[in-house]
Amino acid sequence: MKNTLFILITSIALFFSACLSEKETAFTEKAALEFLYQYMPLGDSVDYTEEYYRECVHYAFLAKQEMPWGASIPEREFKHFVIPVRVNNENLDRFRATYYEELKGRVKDLTLYDAVLEVNHWCHEHVNYKGSDSRTSAPMATIKTSWGRCGEESTLLVTALRTVGIPARQVYTPRWAHCDDNHAWVEAWVDGQWHFLGACEPEPVLDLGWFNEPASRTLLLHTRVFGNYDGPEVVISRSANYTEITVVDNYGKTVKTTFTVVNSDGKPQANLPVEFKIYNYAEFCTVVTKTTDENGQTWLTAGLGCMMAYAAKDGKFGFQVFRSGEKENVTIILNHEKGTEEVFEFDMVPPAPTSVLPEVTAEMRAENDRCIAYEDSLRNAYIADCKKAQQKLIMNTGNKTLCRIYEKTWGNYQTIADFVKYAQGKNQEIKAVELLSNISDKDLRDVSLEVLKDHLDNTPGLEQSIISMPPEHYSQYILSPRVSNEMLVPYRKTLSDFFPEAERRQYHDNPTLLVDWVKNNIKTDDNLALQRIPISPLGVLKARKADRHSRDIFFVSMARSLGIAAQINPVNGNVQYFGKEWTNVNFDAAESANAAVGYLDIQYYPIASVTDPKYYTHFSIKKFDGNSFRLLAYDAKDPGIDDGMMLSTFDHPTPLDEGYYILTAGTRLDDGTALTHSQFFSIKAGETTQLTLVLRQPNDELQVVGSFYADNKFTDPETGEVGNAKQLIQDEYFILGLLDQGSEPTTHAMQDIAAFRKDFEASNLPMIFVFSSKEEYDKFKLKNFSGLPEGIVYGIDDGAIRDDLVESLHLSGDNRPIFIIANTNSEVVFVKQGYTIGLGEQLLKIEKAIGSTHQ
């Protein structure tokens, strides 16, 4: 009896001890807040308040308590994929507090699987795809705009899923291997495993999107997990803020390759960064960096395609192009050095497509299409209301510049209107319009009234600025709050009042003193912003430390606040202020001085397919900084949208700082292979270096790749008349496109074709665009794709054209868009299915080849 009583008492004691232990170690709201502050980057800790993070944590735990799946989410997934507020490099906002109840009402009675699908439908109801610059808007700003690029769409969806307690993460390929672009989508944790979906692109099931096949061709697929994550995925790297993992083996075939870095004597180089590069946008772009161990080795798991591995030390560098799966071990020899003029040519072959699509019944597809149509109608009604409000504002102003500004505001029109009214009340309308004209289009869509007022009221007037400065410099380099890709904040009053009046005058008259102040007072550490999230100027001033990029933004912001014209040079990234001329700022040198300048004269002998090469599309230039080659940015439009200058618009010769460079050019083939040509060259002070831009061409001539029955009929969507390609075209070649209502791949295709409108109108290639239904055609027309060539024939396919193409050309199902070039003899000489960048140029290249064969 005593033994039994002893055992009972002991058991009870152990039970209560375990309960207390569990309570002590439970992941509480307090622990979650500490977790956020332990791993968040410096900018997030100084630019946002503790109250803000408390609110976000509160809603995460509220969702865990109220959502039916809350108790089933493991602590690891909840901690790393629900609690974190940040998804990418977006501005943070109060999305959770604002939309929790609305989203809860949509999903509280659903299974976890169906809830993920429903949240994506909710996102699509508010947002559709459209390209923009590289700065990522906050989720609520994206909703206000009603559209965003893939990075903004996926940031919105991840935020929305986390808001209702569903673990979610953004997955991205830094660069595609088979075409010039990148992409981001979302993975959600459902019942023990991760599933993917296209953000704001609802499908009837998970693991389905237009990018199934492109994803299978990726070399790298990464996600950055907040904190020190110990999940089952392969870890690429760990930092003070995040764990970078790869998920590429979930989408296609992969292999692990080991790399050894040695010097010219064969000695292994320990603790050395190795950059892994993908050819994309006419450059070898670094997509991941790893560090060698004590044996000079590191490794990478990647898709079965070609990449470049690069390393440098003490001014010497080495590189090796490799194809994953061909060799288990690759050696990089540091046997190149600055000043050596060499030429290299590589064929960069992407992985082959290998995708498996989940089953979707006709009923599921029909219901999903019905939902999409309804969501489109809601979003289009919102857009129409915005347009009406914009037109009303335009009608009430006679200022043509202001009219153009209002047209760009989308859902932010009221903020801009309120600002203009505020400025008019202070007799400052001209200055206000100048300010609005010198921020980006995206700024017009998401800037706050507080920011605009601060910069209007606290920016020195032109008369208070440097007199020798050209008048146009005032608006762009003093008045404008936009410096780089930072979050705009109301910093002017704080920065302009920071120094006493006498000190402000000293800095204004002698900007080198301001350079010295920043050197001496702002501690620089690039580990403070490993995710490349700029710290705001106010945050830098508060913390007195920053990464180099945030320091540069801070200097320019402070200089402008003191009436000094300043910028980060958009081409080479140099920080500069304007005295009698633009002067480079060097925070690492005793004195700032401009680099000696030489010139580059690029010669090009036109070929039929490319008469005027385009930067980022056909060629790029990089400068050696002693360790890496840094891309020069020759943008035709706003920076960050990857739209480069035509070679014909470059200065001839083009001024460049003295130094060592590489000119890379490439030709993208139909199968995604890139034929590259790279030249190392030097620029010497006062001298002109002449180079010839080489675009390699394939040796093969025009080839028949399949057949298509040109007698297949389609129906005119407007008249109901039935016709076929043979009747319309007779004995010529033609372009046939099978399109959908306007998905992201179709949108890209239309934009690529519109970019070459005049070329297509002058060509001998008629275009026929067909759709699977009149409803799809009507939705496509609602998209208002501007700039398409005249004379396009539209049709409705009853399935015969689709079935013929899929079967005869061995395509992967009805994955649109599908483009072919064929003739009325049923010969197909070009085929492209799904997501493609540069389609317009590829079609015209085939048109040139057709013309040459007929001569």
PLM regions with names:
Residues 191, 297-309, 313-316, 322-326, ...:
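Short Pro-Gly-centered beta-turn/loop motif in secreted/extracellular proteins
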Residues 264-283, 305-306, 510, 607-637:
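Short, ordered, surface-exposed loop/turn motifs in non-cytosolic proteins
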